[in-house]
Amino acid sequence: MSVKIRMHRAGAKRKPFYRIVVADSRMPRDGRFIEQVGYYNPVSQPKELKLDEDKIFEWLQKGAQPSDTVRSLLSGAGLMAKLHDAKYNK
């Protein structure tokens, strides 16, 4: 089972709202997921991003792969650098 951290679309038509979830890669985009670890609202000004850093860090250490979009959001929040430091600076 390959686990991904990706975005699960919610909200109304033309007003997207994304939940950041941990899901099996074989599940559909808006299908079943294992755990919700944050959300992203690109419509609000300024754009709203909330992440449960402890849970995300735990899943990344277990081997979950973030999607490209989620990876860029995590990099902007500083989580990818934190993971890199924990992994290589023992």
From Swiss-Prot:
Source organism, top-level taxon: Bacteria
Pfam families assigned: Ribosomal_S16
UniProt key word Ribosomal protein: yes
Keyword Disulfide bond attributed: no
Cellular component GO terms held in the UniProt record: cytoplasm; small ribosomal subunit
InterPro entries reported for this sequence: Ribosomal_bS16, Ribosomal_bS16_dom_sf
UniProt keyword annotations, A-Z: Ribonucleoprotein, Ribosomal protein
Protein name (database record): Small ribosomal subunit protein bS16
Organism whose genome encodes this protein: Lactobacillus acidophilus (strain ATCC 700396 / NCK56 / N2 / NCFM)
Gene (name only): rpsP
